[in-house]
């Protein structure tokens, strides 16, 4: 029975979106998903329903389309929106910047205009720690200077500005901006998880594919950083903790009756080799690696100060690195080719 209202989740079939839909359904919300599967898979939608015990409403469509979005709001009584729909590869954004600006900013602009027409103004936005660029001081809090070196990061930074301007122009808007650090792991059922759809861009899915035998070895970029073992340090966050952060944000918009911008991370960094060792322990497989030259633009350490999310929303990451690796391995082992 729906107790808390109906939430529209754009990009709800994706990695973070699917886990968030599970938590929303389990938490008493009804869910409407809009997704065009440009970087997700239809099987994820069915699996969301299997895990949650009840299915979301699903509409296949492009969140950039005003006609699609207007139809969604006309047919369904939407109480709030979580906006995930976006392209997300930094490398691809450097090759196809116009595609990223058109998709990531166009979908948000369409959403803002559609929400406004239908008198719905509670929005949780999926941002990224990419807006902080190359910080040399850690931990990173929300007051750190904002800058970024790639079109993907620019779209997130520009989207945050679009939302800030929208709020300034109309005090009825309530917007929660969530800056994620490094989502990893998978649902404990092994039914949903990250499906890179090719060569992984991020560390843990790459490590997982080495462990399962799909890739020969891991390249570790830099072994001479000023870190405990010389390899880079990042803040890895279990995707279920991240999903629950979105529910905390929805509740926060109602309770606080004002918007906010918060980091979502554990507040603790792990080196690349710590991740490798933890994944070997979780999987029982060796993960061969080779230390190579640093990549241009990398920093040695990047991790969040997530205290503001706890103070404002009561949210704190619960799962440790061992749990992240165990859940990610279960997904990879049970689904060696992802959803295919």
Q: Where are these predicted regions, by residue range?
A:
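Short, basic/glycine-rich phosphate-binding loops at helix/coil junctions
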Residues: 185-187, 224-225
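N-terminal Rossmann-like NAD(P)+-binding domain of SDR-like oxidoreductases, especially those catalyzing
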Residues: 1-186
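Short-chain dehydrogenase/reductase
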Residues: 101, 149-157, 193-201, 205, ...
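Pocket-edge positions in alpha/beta enzyme catalytic cores
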Residues: 61, 73, 100, 143, ...
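C-terminal substrate-binding subdomain of Rossmann-fold SDR/epimerase-dehydratase oxidoreductases
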Residues: 203-340
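Catalytic core of nucleotidyl cyclases, primarily class III adenylyl/guanylyl cyclases
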Residues: 189-191
